[in-house]
């Protein structure tokens, strides 16, 4: 409830609406407080609690090399190209939770789908790869350096479906990725 951010607010509202419509909803997330906090500092305890009527299952975030991430991220912010190794470092040293990805892969049959929002985070990237056939993406896509990463292309092209928040967002995705076979809303 108290976590700021546009994508977080959108997901919170979506969860409440789905729950109100009678769907079983559970949020899978990390123990990190918010986007602006230290991504390797686990503030919340791992486990499940009910927040605003919706179960929230939290997983420990991994430690990370912030300086290495910041070096690559600075280049991406300036729309500079990065090597495949730097791209892998970007996803690896961003906010991550191997426990979360193992849970998704090991409990996929317990869920109808996994909704990932927004696109450029380690939790989205590795979460989609853990179970692409049940992954839905709400990308919040912008024409920025992150959008041009091959790993981002990979998840856009592997997910079961994509929900775009605007027509320009969908048009950008169509220009950047091969999403013709992906269900879109």
Please place each PLM-identified region on the residue numbering:
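N-terminal subdomain of nucleotide-sugar transferases
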Residues: 1-57, 109
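Alpha-helix capping/helix-boundary segments
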Residues: 33, 120-123, 168-170
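Conserved nucleotide-sugar donor-binding subdomain of glycosyltransferases
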Residues: 67-122
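Active-site proximal beta-strand in glycosyltransferases
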Residues: 110-120, 124-143, 163
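A short acidic, amphipathic alpha-helical/loop segment
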Residues: 126-130, 150-154, 176
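A conserved, positively charged/aromatic
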Residues: 135-140, 146-160
């Amino acid at each position: 409830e108290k976590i700021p951010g546009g994508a977080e607010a959108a997901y919170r509202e979506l969860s409440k609406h789905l729950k109100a419509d009678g769907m079983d909803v559970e949020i899978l997330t990390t123990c990190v407080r918010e986007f602006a906090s230290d991504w390797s500092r686990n503030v919340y305890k791992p486990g499940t609690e009910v927040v605003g009527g919706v179960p929230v299952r939290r997983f420990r975030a991994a430690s990370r090399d912030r300086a290495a991430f910041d070096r690559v991220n600075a280049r991406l912010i300036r729309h500079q190209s990065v090597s495949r190794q730097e791209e892998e470092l970007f996803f690896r040293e961003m906010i991550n939770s191997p426990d979360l990805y193992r849970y998704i892969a090991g409990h996929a049959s317990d869920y109808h789908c996994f909704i990932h929002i927004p696109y450029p985070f380690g939790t989205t990237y590795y979460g989609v790869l853990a179970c692409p056939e049940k992954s839905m993406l709400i990308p919040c896509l912008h024409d920025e350096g992150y959008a041009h990463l091959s790993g981002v292309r990979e998840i856009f092209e592997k997910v079961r479906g994509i929900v775009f928040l605007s027509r320009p967002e969908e048009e950008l995705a169509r220009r950047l990725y091969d999403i013709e076979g992906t269900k879109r809303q």
